[in-house]
Amino acid sequence: MSVIESIRGVLWARRHRPDQVAIVMGASHERFAPQELLRQAVLAEEAGFDAVACSDHLTPWWVPGGLAPAHCGNAWVWLGAASQATGAIGLGTGVTGVIHRYNPVVVAQQVATLEALAPGRTFLGVGSSEAMNEVPAGMRWPDTAEQLQRTAEALEIIVRLLDGETVDFRGVYFTTTGARLYDRPARRPPVIVSAFHEQIAEVAGQLADGLWTLGSPTIAPKVIAAYRRGAEKAGREPGEIWLQALAATGADDDEALAGSREWKPALVQELYTHDIHSTGDIQAKGEDVSDGQFTRANLVSADPGSHVAKLRLLSELGATGIVVVNASGADPEGLIRLYGRDVLPRLREG
């Protein structure tokens, strides 16, 4: 079985038609405590989501105790618990940074272990992280060129280890000596790369099994095209294309917006590339995002029809999977129930 077939085995298990788009719930460690997120994962499986992708952050997007509660449980410890609390839903990170804080050998070991605990259900989302997650851990935040090279080196190591190689690697930033996975699962977890810019998207096409980017009509087409170019250059079939948006609901649209405003910094591109790492500075950057910009870019509405319409627009951009990040602070479990009752069935009926 190819890696692409293996990921489709995870995400297409509930498909009524093979062309349906996978809907993945984003579980937000920054906003919800670990036990609460476990409850959300169980509810997501019951509601009919195809997978759960949990964030992997050390620092939240806002000042603790300000706009919203702030948490940041460890993604990999939580995924181990989620693998035992759920039975069939896909599980993985959305996404793990691989430039500093995590060594790529350890990342490969972590996802291989998760696959052993949840056979046939796992995937690995990786990216270059943000300064907020690296600088507090004592790491130097690199410029964009170094971020790109670090990510490419880490990605090569991870993929080779998951493919069963013993890896001797001498890169500019990473080195391995006889590294291997001693508990390598029978099925190789697919690796999906987060990319907001064309250069890393092209690397993803050359080395990885899928692309993960923002569901923006101005960003997604260029990034997707670069990903496909990279795959073509490497003589590979393009894999999965996941588009991401935040989602929130409430008693009405005003409550949906009020319960998700803390997420505005996630729309600021500068936070993904520049050394901005304090929660105060991060939150301040989000203040430049208007309510209108925030709601247009995301799924923020009490009306399930609005969610369905926007998800269909994302599908038309070329998505094979859509990551719906649960940003519904007013009623996170209500968002999951809304999707299970009124959104997912309408999407899947055509």
Model-derived segments and spans:
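Active-site-adjacent structural elements that line small-molecule/cofactor binding pockets in enzymes
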Residues: 1-350
